[in-house]
């Protein structure tokens, strides 16, 4: 045994094989204590097993397990974790904050054991699957209820093996306010058709949202997005080096956008700017760098 302890009314043990076992103290039902992580603080107050994150290879559980309202950073940095089978029957209907829960779980190949999670009360999903670089698709999340989510920042950023977003096509994003870095450096994505029905009418910020998606060849999946309340679009498509055209975005409402710095910067294949002339950029503070490193900026001065 490497370590053991108690979280709320759940006892846990981590054995020499890397198996993290959770079971209720009374053998029947238990609830985790809420996360104590203070973001941007040097005073780390995560779960006790976070100290051994690199040794955790699989998770198992027995009895009825209830997730706390705040489960942020619960398995942060479990870079050797390959199985989530112990989580499939967890009661998650009280969860509000799942931020960074599986952040930097490099070797997770699928999320099948999370497919039945009740996420109807979750508000914060930021960094939830950040740097899950072995994930190839998100089909397991297709039934997640995201109706109350407000923050999706960096949710799938650096998921470099993701090839499509079909699993997200029915997500309810009505209440999301921030989508910064959501798909940042998802370098294997070739299209965005899976999110074409997303309601983005309340989103305020989309900075770096698709930056580094170097395999994207078109933006047709975004043509019907409502961007009427977006203020920040800086670096949104930066280094989408396979994009040849932005014509699909011709009907975007950019009347409230104030920052577009390097929005299409380093889009080295971009040759067709048809559609950009339709945009209202009256409130944009600096227009000179929108197409930095890809076209003559004099056109937009």
Regions found by a protein language model. Name each.
Residues 1-301:
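Negatively charged
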